[in-house]
Every structure is written in C-alpha cells, then in structure tokens.
Amino acid sequence: MTRSAKKGPFCDASLVKKVEVAQANKDKKPIKTWSRRSTILPDFIGLTIAVHNGRQHVPVYVSENMVGHKLGEFALTRTFKGHAADKKVTKK
C-alpha cells in the first residue's frame, strides 16, 4: 500500500537540516546519511547524498526524475556475483 496523500512525504528532520545548510553555503560535497527511508524532496535536486547501504556510503546525485522516490532505492544493499558456471559441459 502507498502512503496516504493527506500525511505527505516522510523525510528525516536531520537530513532536511543538512540539506538546508548545504544549499545556504552552496556546498557541493556529499551529505552523509543513514536514512534510506527518507523521500527525495524537490529541495534535494542538484545535491549529492551519500546513502549508507550497510557497508559503505554510496554517492547518489539527485535529479528531477528521482523526486518522490526513497533514497534507499538508489543504493543497492545486495551484490550479485553470478551463479557458478557448470563445469560438466559435455560435447556430443
């Protein structure tokens, strides 16, 4: 189920504060956050946010298409290395 429209988007207060400071100072360095659950707001456009994926912070550059999505969608937590190759290949 989606979030109720009357509630509005969720965004951590600490992240909003960091974004406001970065925009006021015209700071371009990434903003570190562990808040994967926060919704990307229009204020975030043009900023780089380093989102924690459980192991490291993945830099995510926010564009217009990302508004309304969650930060965690852009920092993958699982790495797929591929299935093991079948070594019993027989030629006929």
Curated annotation (Swiss-Prot):
Pfam family, one: Ribosomal_S19
GO MF term set: rRNA binding; structural constituent of ribosome
Any one GO CC term of the record: cytoplasm
Keyword set, alphabetical order: Ribonucleoprotein, Ribosomal protein, RNA-binding, rRNA-binding
InterPro entries for the chain: Ribosomal_uS19, Ribosomal_uS19_bac-type, Ribosomal_uS19_CS, Ribosomal_uS19_SF
Gene3D superfamilies: 30s Ribosomal Protein S19, Chain A (3.30.860.10)
PROSITE patterns reported for this sequence: RIBOSOMAL_S19
Listed GO biological process terms: ribosomal small subunit assembly; translation
PANTHER family the UniProt entry points to: RIBOSOMAL PROTEIN S19P FAMILY MEMBER (PTHR11880), SMALL RIBOSOMAL SUBUNIT PROTEIN US19M (PTHR11880:SF8)
Known role: Protein S19 forms a complex with S13 that binds strongly to the 16S ribosomal RNA.
Similarity comment text for this entry: Belongs to the universal ribosomal protein uS19 family.
Protein name per its UniProtKB record: Small ribosomal subunit protein uS19
Gene assigned in the entry: rpsS
